[in-house]
Every structure is written in structure tokens, then in C-alpha cells.
């Protein structure tokens, strides 16, 4: 697929999503995942699909598509999908799982120094959130 065709399809999928035509967006992004685009672009389309499923309230499907995105990017020493998954896990109140992902990223040798700083900052924020005391009213 040439780049212009790819970009037109992505744009169309985004327009469908923004217009609330979720099914059309899913079909477009899924077709792109099943096409001859690069693994990195397939990973990005999986991330788009994960966002669509989250919008539909289907957390399990969303998590499955994040996992697929990670599988496409991992052989290429990329980690964008892992960071997005960690962010999503934090949003759905699963900070410990997010922390595990970011900790595993720090152990990898393919992070740039700037990446390490960003990931460390995210780890520290998660640790603060995890260790934040929870106050409950007596008898509640």
C-alpha cells in the first residue's frame, strides 16, 4: 500500500470515529492491521482500535488490542504501545499493573537517556499514587 492511500484510510477512520461511526472506524483500522503495512503502523492501528473499544466501554477488548500493538512493535525494539498501555491501566485504576510494565521497560537496553528520564518520572508518579493513603470515614 502506498503512503498516500494509507494516510487517507487512517484519516477516514479517524473521521468516522470522531463522527461517532464507531463500527466504520473499527472496520477501517482492522482492515489496515490485516493489510501489508509495516509492523510499526500495524501497532499504531491496534492502538487506535484499543481506544475505540475503550470508548465502547469494553475494557477487555481494549486491553487485548493494546497487547496486540505491543506484539507488533516489540521485535523492532519499540515501546510506545507499552507506555500507552501503562497510561491506560493507570486511567482504569490499575496502577500496580502499569508500574510493572514501566519497571520492565527500565530493564531494557533500547531506551534512550531521554526515554529513561520520562519513564522514571512516570514510575515515580505511579509510586506516589499507589502509596497515597486512602481515608475512609469511620463506620463507612
Residue ranges and their predicted role:
Residues 5-35:
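Alpha-helical segment of the N-proximal tetratricopeptide repeat
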Residues 90-113, 124:
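TPR/TPR-like (Sel1-like) alpha-helical repeat modules
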Amino acid at each position: 500500500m502506498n503512503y498516500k492511500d494509507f494516510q487517507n484510510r487512517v484519516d477516514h477512520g479517524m473521521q468516522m470515529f470522531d463522527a461517532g461511526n464507531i463500527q466504520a472506524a473499527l472496520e477501517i483500522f482492522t482492515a489496515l492491521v490485516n493489510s501489508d503495512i509495516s509492523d510499526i503502523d500495524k501497532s499504531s492501528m491496534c492502538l487506535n482500535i484499543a481506544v475505540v473499544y475503550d470508548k465502547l466501554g469494553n475494557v477487555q477488548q481494549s486491553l487485548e488490542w493494546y497487547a496486540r500493538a505491543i506484539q507488533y512493535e516489540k521485535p523492532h525494539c519499540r515501546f510506545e504501545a507499552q507506555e500507552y498501555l501503562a497510561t491506560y491501566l493507570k486511567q482504569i485504576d490499575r496502577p500496580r499493573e502499569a508500574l510493572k510494565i514501566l519497571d520492565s521497560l527500565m530493564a531494557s537496553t533500547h531506551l534512550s537517556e531521554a526515554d529513561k528520564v520520562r519513564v522514571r518520572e512516570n514510575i515515580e508518579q505511579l509510586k506516589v499514587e499507589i502509596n497515597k493513603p486512602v481515608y475512609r470515614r469511620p463506620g463507612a
